[in-house]
Each structure stands twice: as structure tokens, then as C-alpha cells.
Amino acid sequence: MSVFNEIEKCGELHSSEFGFFNVLGTTVGTNGYQGGDAGHGGRTYICFEDLANTALEARVSKGEYGNSKVEILLGGDSELDCIIESLRWAADTLESIANPPRE
């Protein structure tokens, strides 16, 4: 599945900035629950962006069994504060815009 040509399927994207001694931009979007796996059309997007002085590294690789793996490494106390706030905001935002799961 090539996801990046399907970002528009996530609907409206929501963005926020988190800053202390650095600024971390976070963007999320989802078209909510679609009744199953990726073949059913559900898409969720999350992006972290260094907007100012964020010690941020990311790596996409294959795990031990060929599965996808995403690693994010941040350096510094301010970055720790920012990622905590960013992840909390991202989870709350995704939860609020996702339609209820189907029974």
C-alpha cells in the first residue's frame, strides 16, 4: 500500500505547534473507522515537523520479520516536553474526529 498518495483520503488535516526552547509542529488527520483493515479504506495520518531548533531524527526500516518499523529519536529536555504534549494532542484530536467504530 502506497499511503502517501492517499493522504487526501484522511479528510481535513489538523495542525498545532508545541514549543519550549524548540518548536515541534504536529499534523494529524483521519477518515475514521471504515470497518476493517486498510483494504476497507480507513486512513490515518500523523506528521511531526521541526519548526525551530528541534533535535529530531526519524528512521523507517523493516523489522525482524519484514514488517514496517518507524523510529523517532528526540534529543533534549524541551523536546521531551514537546513530544509529550504533541502526542497527547494528537491522540485527543484523532479521537475527536474519528467516527464511532462499527459494531
Describe every region a protein language model picked out.
Residues 1-103:
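Positively charged, low-complexity terminal tracts
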